[in-house]
């Protein structure tokens, strides 16, 4: 198509809409043809509104039986940052567990909670979580606890090592560890890894990464 000119915010929305078709085409190209591919665009409303949340849950839970792989993204083309901000502020007046859904890691964690998934894999630009964010040799391979309470404490300890570091992206690590707390409480195993390693390599233990789980 042609290059789009005009108001920056509108151009960004227009390109986001075009990008969805490119993204889905890429997934269709690389996913085994025996599986169907489904695009699911979400906003904070799909997690904060009980009826919408239940509909999303049912849609996702039907996918495995129907041989479908859901590709979930934020609905950028139809979302408004200003409107979302106002809506979220209103929700925060009456409840504490408001989902913002402004970050892919937060969205992934909310999906994991919704369907109570066994495994949650979050890709990042690093190999995982470091005890010293300035030194990649300090990769934390396992964060464990005998129960969810002990595990969350271990995650908080890992977060404290990220705060105040000079390494670019360390604050992103803090956010990732915060978002995964709820899935961990639900019993999910979480992997934080680098996308140069395949899903099977990460989950199979053949890739350097951080695995977070309740020890048995």
Predicted segments with their positions:
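C-terminal catalytic "cap/lid" subdomain
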Residues: 1-216
């Amino acid at each position: 198509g042609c290059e789009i000119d005009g108001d920056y915010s509108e151009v960004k929305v227009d390109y986001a809409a075009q990008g969805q078709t490119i993204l889905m085409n890429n997934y269709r190209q690389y996913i085994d043809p025996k599986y169907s591919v489904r695009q699911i665009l979400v906003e904070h409303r799909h997690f904060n509104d009980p009826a919408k949340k239940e509909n999303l849950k049912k849609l996702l839970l039907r996918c495995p039986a129907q041989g479908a792989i859901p590709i979930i993204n934020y609905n950028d083309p139809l979302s408004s940052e200003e409107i979302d901000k106002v809506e979220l502020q209103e929700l925060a007046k009456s409840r504490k567990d408001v989902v913002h859904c402004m970050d892919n890691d937060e969205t992934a964690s909310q999906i994991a909670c919704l369907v109570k998934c066994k495994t949650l894999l979050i890709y990042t630009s690093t190999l995982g979580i470091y005890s010293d964010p300035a030194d990649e040799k300090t990769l934390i391979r396992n964060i464990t606890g005998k129960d969810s309470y002990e595990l969350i404490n271990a995650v908080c300890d890992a977060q404290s090592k990220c705060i105040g570091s000079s390494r670019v992206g360390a604050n992103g690590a803090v956010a990732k560890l915060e978002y995964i707390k709820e899935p961990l409480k639900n019993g999910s195993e979480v992997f934080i890894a680098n996308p140069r390693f395949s899903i099977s390599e990460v989950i199979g233990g053949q890739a350097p990464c951080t695995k977070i789980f309740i020890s048995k």
